[in-house]
Amino acid sequence: MSTDMETAVVGKVDPEAPQPTHIDVHIHQESALAKLLLAGCSLLRIPASASTQSQGSSRVLVASWVVQTVLGALSVVLGGTLYIGHYLAMYSEGAPFWTGIVAMLAGAVAFLHKKRGGTCWALMRTLLVLASFCTAVAAIVIGSRELNFYWYFLGDDVCQRDSSYGWSTMPRTTPVPEEADRIALCIYYTSMLKTLLMSLQAMLLGIWVLLLLASLTPVCVYIWKRFFTKAETEEKKLLGAAVI
């Protein structure tokens, strides 16, 4: 039964003529308008990297403002410590105080300008950045000049003096053992005090150097952004010329 059906089907198919085969060849060539649109789409992807770079530079600026504020506070605190001791000539110029105050003001005004904007805040921010740079340079010069300077009562003979401020009319005699021990202990503590004061001055110098670098950060970020934008513009021009 199935064999007869297959024979019948074959009999029906065989008389039919073979269908012609059509091969359609389409040659597609992009127009100049399509190329321009593709180039525009590719160029629109570049600002994504630019926005990423802008966010990175903004974070660097915020970090520099925080560093300025913290270092300014540390400068004031260390300056107050040295002023309490009043053993150094550095406190007479007040370098730790005006340097720290200007740095803290520069950081605070930068944050306010970022939050509120405005020409007045921008002008104040620029002036305080310049002032922070100048005060940091002046403080470094003063601190390096007076790094090893001590007042008269911290000299080498501070432990040999009498308790009175007048000239002693008694001739010098060989100190007794108790007096010799006292002098030795006094010299030991005086040397420790000198080491402490030198360390505080070195810390202040380090803080002022960091403040100098922090005040230069906005300028460095601005120059870097200018070069980055210039490189992006040249890349866009080259890409557009290559597409056209």
UniProtKB/Swiss-Prot annotation:
It is found in: Membrane. The keyword Phosphoprotein applies. GO terms for cellular component: membrane. InterPro entries: CD20-like (IPR007237), TMEM176A/TMEM176B (IPR009281). Belongs to the TMEM176 family. The keyword Membrane applies. Pfam families: CD20 (PF04103). GO terms for biological process: negative regulation of dendritic cell differentiation. Specifically expressed in lung, kidney and spleen. Keywords: Membrane, Phosphoprotein, Transmembrane, Transmembrane helix. Its main location: membrane. The modification Phosphoserine is found at residue 42. It is a multi-pass membrane protein. Induction: Up-regulated in kidney upon proteinuria. This is Transmembrane protein 176A. The chain crosses the membrane at residues 60-80, 92-112, 122-142, 204-224. Interacts with MCOLN2.
